[in-house]
Amino acid sequence: MDSPTLLLFIFASIFYFITFQIVKLGFNVVMTSKKTKRRRLPLPPGPKPLPIIGNVLELGPKPHRSFANLAKVHGPLMSLRLGSVTTIIVSSSDVAKEMFLKNDQPLSSNRTIPNSVTAGDHHLLTMSWLPVSPKWRSFRKITTFHLLSPQRLDSCCSLRQAKVQQLFEYVLECSRTGQTVDIGKAAFTTSLNLLSKLFFSLELAHHRSSKSQEFKDLIWDIMEDIGKPNYADYFPCLKYFDPCGIRRRLANSFEKLIEVFQGIIRQRLSLSSGSDTHNDVLDVLLQLYKQKELSMDEINHLLVDIFDAGTDTTSSTFEWAMAELIKSPKTMEKAQAEIKLVLGKESHIQESDIPKLPYLRAIIKETLRLHPPTVFLLPRKAETDVELYGYTVPKNAQILVNLWALGRDPKVWENPDVFLPERFLTCDIDVKGRDFGLLPFGAGRRICPGMNLAYRMLTLMLATLLQSFDWKLPNELNPRNLDMDEKFGIALQKTKPLEIIPVCKD
């Protein structure tokens, strides 16, 4: 074989060898991909999506109820396509338990950010929306250890007692004049003044002022706008246009609330003497600001989060508790009898008395079961493909835990739609994220840091108003006909405020 022919043969052999290897490699990749696809578990079941819009029409005006009804058909772990967003809905305690115990990190580290909370860069400046990161851990530490630590809560026990005493005096005045009490507004004012006194050493409103209702309306606007469905979240091309105007409204609400905080902060910073300390939370925040651990924007948005969560959700839950008791007079009488048995007629209730009142605490738990402070846990985003309950939660999917449905899981709760505090007298279930049929404050690393403060205030306010007053509806309305309709936001408020008449006990 001559040299040119030999070279041609060698090149041809090399070419065919390389071609064969490429084909073989491609074949192996295809086969491996097919095997992987065969091994990968399917998405959770769900209703068939429509072209382009997916399952958006399934949401309805009350998505928590819509999702709970769909879960009865498709199962406790369900997938929907909301526009272009794959959304996984958790609707049972079994699924929630597996999610938090086995997959808390990949399913809780990131958030799906609603377009609305990008207003004013809120999502970058607050712990609620940040991914788990050094910055998030720093915020969590500041909140847990500096602002809402058990030591600080214990030290402000007398402050809570004083605010509840103001509530009592307002209700007593109403009882003497035969006036109705707007229970939600009264509880909101109490919660607002507790936080403002704890944080700023001043009160932002009082029970007879219009300021209280203005704050309540402003906070609800924020809660409603963050919670409501938004087309900009489902169709990325719309996020720049804000078609529903939600982001613009939320930016305006943030500005109004921050303006209040900034007025207080400017006044505090203007104090010339370094010895003028108030020993309150604002002093702590400003010290962290001076040490460059927090920026002023971060302080502003941290306060927005805390005052949102600490006023509206607490007052809404309290209003639901009183509404359930009005509808169930025998339950109210039983709670009042327990208080009388433990404390007698003369002694005013103290926070230290609450552990002696198991039925009262059962009423609070039952209210939190039926009316959780937030309807859904804030939306999470899967970091990677995750196996959950025999299905695949795909990377970047949005995960919504339907707390309203968990509290009505028939596998956990007998007669789940019935208000029955007695169920908690025979079981050791708490609200601290360990029992997955009752997660009113969440679970895992993102559990609500204000849980203990909210629970203490709810029990103390309820005990005080039940100890000193009987309650009735105006115009001799039958309690069974009480309107229990709800309006949707991050929390659920009564559509029609609960206005009832206090009758002072002899």
UniProtKB/Swiss-Prot annotation:
The chain crosses the membrane at residues 7-27. Heme binds at residue 448. One of its GO terms (molecular function) is monooxygenase activity. One of its GO terms (cellular component) is membrane. It comes from the Eukaryota. Expressed at low levels mainly in epidermis and chlorenchyma tissues. InterPro entries: Cyt_P450, Cyt_P450_CS, Cyt_P450_E_grp-I, Cyt_P450_sf. Keywords: Alkaloid metabolism, Glycoprotein, Heme, Iron, Membrane, Metal-binding, Monooxygenase, Oxidoreductase, Transmembrane, Transmembrane helix. Pfam families: p450. Glycans are attached at residue 110. Disulfide bonds: none annotated. It is found in: Membrane. Its EC number is 1.14.-.-. Pathway: Aromatic compound metabolism; Alkaloid biosynthesis. It is a single-pass membrane protein. Its main location: membrane. It catalyses: L-tyrosine + reduced [NADPH--hemoprotein reductase] + O2 = L-dopa + oxidized [NADPH--hemoprotein reductase] + H2O + H(+). Belongs to the cytochrome P450 family. Cytochrome P450 monooxygenase participating in the biosynthesis of natural products derived from phenylethylamine, including mescaline, a natural hallucinogen potentially used in psychotherapeutic treatments. Catalyzes the 3-hydroxylation of L-tyrosine to produce L-DOPA. No activity toward tyramine. This is Cytochrome P450 monooxygenase 76AD94.
